[in-house]
């Protein structure tokens, strides 16, 4: 993932806003995300784990997808998931949905991290097969279902442009530059 300042993005055509942005810093950020949703089926000791990926841009979209998964799979016992939002990849959450602590959400999120994805949701719907899998078995099953769903997705590298215009006294410039550097801007 390469981030950095640019001189003139295509999004700001010569006559379309560029003149206004002439003295501003424009930053282009690249990130990987889901273009086309993916699905997987993983079976272990009679249980079925259905993996799904979706492109999302807000927590509300995540909630809506999870509600739809629950409605579409009323006989399932768990709908576990993880998501990450934003080019900075700092906004994320995961849920074990009643499975033993850290046996579902973290393994799913680990696959999102490993793939370097953001603005995506990975959900795994579990149908219980009558045999307990134990902590290690659950971790492996949720991890594998998530991994296979991600592999079946179409992943693209996307770019966003951010325009920053900062006004300050010349004497404050070193502090401003340090802050920008700390924010990786």
Predicted regions and their residues:
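Short amphipathic alpha-helix segments
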Residues: 167-185
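C-terminal regulatory domains involved in ligand/effector binding and gene-expression control
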Residues: 7, 12, 18, 22-103
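Positively charged, aromatic-enriched nucleic acid-contacting surfaces
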Residues: 100-117
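Stable alpha-helical structural segments in soluble proteins, enriched in small hydrophobic residues
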Residues: 141, 145-153
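Short glycine-/aliphatic-rich beta-strand segments at the starts of folded cytosolic domains
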Residues: 155-170
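Glycine- and acidic-rich phosphate- and metal-coordinating loops
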Residues: 118-128
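Conserved structured catalytic cores and adjacent interaction surfaces
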Residues: 137-139
């Amino acid at each position: 993932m390469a981030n950095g300042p640019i001189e003139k993005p295509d999004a700001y055509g010569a006559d379309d806003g560029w003149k206004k942005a002439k003295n501003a810093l424009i930053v282009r950020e690249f990130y990987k995300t889901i273009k086309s949703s993916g699905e997987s089926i993983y079976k272990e000791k009679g249980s079925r784990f259905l993996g799904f990926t979706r492109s999302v841009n807000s927590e509300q979209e995540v909630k809506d997808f999870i509600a739809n998964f629950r409605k579409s799979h009323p006989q399932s016992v768990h709908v576990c998931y993880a998501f990450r939002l934003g080019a900075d990849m700092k906004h994320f959450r995961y849920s074990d949905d009643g499975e033993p602590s850290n046996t579902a959400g973290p393994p799913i999120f680990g696959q999102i991290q490993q793939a370097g994805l953001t603005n995506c949701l990975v959900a795994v719907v579990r149908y219980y097969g009558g045999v307990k899998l134990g902590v290690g078995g659950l971790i492996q099953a949720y991890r594998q279902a998530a991994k296979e769903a991600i592999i079946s997705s179409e992943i693209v590298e996307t770019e966003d442009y951010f325009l920053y215009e900062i006004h300050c006294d010349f004497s404050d410039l070193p502090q401003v530059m340090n802050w920008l550097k700390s924010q990786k801007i």
